[in-house]
Amino acid sequence: MAEQEEKQTRRATAARKTQETDITISISLDGTGSSSIESGIGFLDHMLTSFSRHSGIDITLQCQGDLVVDDHHTVEDIAIVLGGAITEALGEKRGIRRYGWAMIPMDEALARCAVDLGGRSCSVFRAEFSRPLIEGLSTEMVEHFFTSLAGSMNANIHIAILEGRNTHHKIEAIFKAFAYAMKDAIKVEGNAVPSTKGVF
């Protein structure tokens, strides 16, 4: 019963307002993968919608960013706020698997992602993109998104593209691999903190 009650409360809302962005994100870790994403960047909306669907995490995201400058502040701050919301929703992380990994194909592209939610912030990203921009998103910001997310979540995120040519396919495979890795890592299997320390 206690485990069920904890799962039902794994929801959070996080916000950030600066002179560059105004962002509010609400999530439910035990959702159905439904989402409403309005980042102002079409391709980022597509990727976050895909992440929500495949992870099972419900996400509502509203962002007003200084896109007249570029997409840097918007992408970075969305990652910071999303990471904060996930951290808050996880609470003490009792009973979670903690670790998750996935290898996902998207046509000729193949992405691998491994996640550790144990409180140690680290991001390793190995991918190259032939296009500098795709549907409003600077492809160099994909790595920065996951670096910022790992820092905000205090998570260890390893991402690598093993095969691929098409930029769209490679980035979409990355977000889907991250989704399935997170889906595993946040699963509740008991009530203990998954660490020999007893705490994170």
From Swiss-Prot:
Catalysed reaction, written as an equation: D-erythro-1-(imidazol-4-yl)glycerol 3-phosphate = 3-(imidazol-4-yl)-2-oxopropyl phosphate + H2O
Q: Which UniProt keywords apply?
A: Amino-acid biosynthesis, Cytoplasm, Histidine biosynthesis, Lyase
Keyword Cytoplasm applies: yes
Q: Which Pfam families match?
A: IGPD (PF00475)
Q: Name one GO biological process term.
A: L-histidine biosynthetic process
Q: Which InterPro entries match?
A: IGPD_sf, ImidazoleglycerolP_deHydtase, ImidazoleglycerP_deHydtase_CS, Ribosomal_Su5_D2-typ_SF
What are its E.C. numbers?
Answer: 4.2.1.19
Q: Which GO terms describe its cellular component?
A: cytoplasm
Is Amino-acid biosynthesis there in the keyword field? yes
Which pathway is this protein engaged in? Answer: Amino-acid biosynthesis; L-histidine biosynthesis; L-histidine from 5-phospho-alpha-D-ribose 1-diphosphate: step 6/9
PANTHER family found in the cross-reference section:
IMIDAZOLEGLYCEROL-PHOSPHATE DEHYDRATASE, IMIDAZOLEGLYCEROL-PHOSPHATE DEHYDRATASE HIS7
Q: Which NCBIfam families match?
A: PRK00951.2-1 (NF002111), PRK00951.2-4 (NF002114)
State the family it belongs to: Belongs to the imidazoleglycerol-phosphate dehydratase family.
Q: How is this protein named in the record?
A: Imidazoleglycerol-phosphate dehydratase
